[in-house]
Amino acid sequence: MQRFLPLILILILLLPLRAQERRDRAVFEVRRDAMLDSIETFLQKEKPARAPRKLMQLDFSTVQGPAAVSEFKSVWHLPPALQGLSGMCWCFSTTSMLESEIHRQSGRVIDLSELYTVYWEHVEKAREFVRTRGRSFHGEGSESNAVFRIWKKYGCLPAAAYTGLKSGATFHDHENTLFPEIHSYLASVKAANAWNEETVVSTVRAILDHYLGAPPAVVTVDGVKYTPQEYLARVVRIDPDDYVDLLSLMEKPWYEKVEFPVPDNWWHSADYYNIPLDEFMAAIKSAIRKGYSIEIGGDMSEPGYSRGAAGMAVVPSWDIPAAFIDDEARQFRFSNGTTADDHGLHLVGYVEKDGKDWYLIKDSWSSAYNSSHPGYYFFHEDYVRLKMLCCSMHKDAAKEVLARFK
């Protein structure tokens, strides 16, 4: 009996831990996005007729998470804004972060134009399409650091000076109009081998001008006229070079600047600081606690990602236990395609519950507007660990990470 005593004691000690483990339930439901439906109805978009399909997802009624935005300790940020039917999340999330940065650094409130950045990103995509003779990826999306790249070249504008919405429009609709027309035109350029950059760029700009309006060359603020470059330098006073991108993928060497291997990184930026998962999470935890907000990007296709009233993102216990979320688990999902670079978001707050962080996420996509906290998601720390691939933040918030690099 004595030789079994240590084993019995271990089992007794483990029983309370076992009892405390969260055991989630699954349900099969038709995923509905009420806000997206209302946008499509407003835009008179016809949906293809198909029978509703029930999908396996988490029963969020069993999840004990934050109940309200007010529970979070948050940094200053402007209210959420809808991106409509478009792939502009990369710009909405990063612009939101930079608006928060302006306030953090100077206390000023400046609402910036996302569509001005998007306009010039389309132009740069067209240039690259010509340069590579049609081999570059052409899609609606991009990455967070595209905002920094565009600002350095073209500057920026206040939101009131350039909305990208024609008179009477309420929602952006690039999926049915702007993007298909540009994409079709570039396909015709490739088919005809008509690689005249000046012609291609001027045609793409004509399409952009038709749907978004031409961006102003000069803006007047408080009685002073500025070009977009002057507005960035003299009014906004944000240095795009002060922001860094962190990545955590074990397929790339640790502690090196690497390329983020996803289609939306169409210009093959290799400016991502690749670090192990624990350091990636430590950087996020440290930054938000020091008052820095963070742009994050990753996957939103999971059964633990609510499209409805819950407004949460968690990793169900029947997916993977929290203790097993590590570098290998992340990489496995990225390698097999179940984690993708779906969406860009703005992390603006945190609250600690039961020893784990919940993050307040400002979101521009329609599904964030179906809950009791419209425009926001509540992300559990484990969801960020498993499914968020990269993030952007001020370099001062990442000093400890950057010190590991040569």
Question: Which functions belong to the PLM regions below?
Answer:
Residues 86, 90-102, 106:
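Alpha-helical support elements that line or immediately flank enzyme active sites
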Residues 21-23, 198, 202-406:
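Active-site signature of cysteine proteases
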Residues 91, 116-119, 147-150, 158-161, ...:
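Structural recognition of the beta-strand scaffold that forms the well-ordered cores
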Residues 1-22:
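Bacterial Sec-dependent N-terminal signal peptides
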Residues 67-83, 108-117:
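An N-terminal structural lobe/cap that precedes and organizes the functional/catalytic core
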Residues 21-79:
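N-terminal regions that are enriched for targeting/export leaders
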